[in-house]
Amino acid sequence: MTTSAPPLVLLVEDDHGVRRPLEKFLQMHHFEVVTAETADDAIDAIHLHHPLAAIIDLRLARGSGRDVVVSMPAGTPVIIFSGVPSESAELERLRPRTRLVQKPYSLTMLVEELKEMISSAKLSQH
């Protein structure tokens, strides 16, 4: 009997008080998580780890989450955090498999959205 590895998710959030609990919550829901605090670190993580999906805060202290979003491979599911919906609306329209989650957000809803997006992406690859 073989078991598949948990889906690898890139979490880009510069606020430790948000990033750490979200990372733990995702791990509790059977995701493997790679974290990054800056846009540069996130872009490096994309190339190094090839995540199956990403959760990205648009407003980072160092760099722009927007740069991370456009660096994700086409077809990779991306959830964008934003307190300002107009910031991410353009990215959501331009990039397939991108969804906006407005702050504040429900962790349960976030995980369900992530699972649905990953499942949909896997189905479209076959």
PLM ranges: what are they?
Residues H16-V34:
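Two-component/phosphorelay signaling modules centered on CheY-like receiver
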Residues E13:
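Conserved acidic carboxylate
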Residues M1-L10, S106-H126:
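Non-catalytic signal-transmission and effector/linker regions of two-component phosphorelay proteins
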Residues T35-A53:
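Acidic, metal-coordinating helix/loop segments flanking the phosphotransfer/catalytic sites
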Residues H16, E37-D41, T108:
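Acidic phosphotransfer microenvironment of two-component signaling modules
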Residues K103:
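A Lys-centered signature of the CheY-like receiver
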Residues F81-S82:
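Hydrophobic/aromatic residues positioned on beta-strands within the core alpha/beta folds
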Residues D57-M72, P85:
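Conserved phosphotransfer microenvironments
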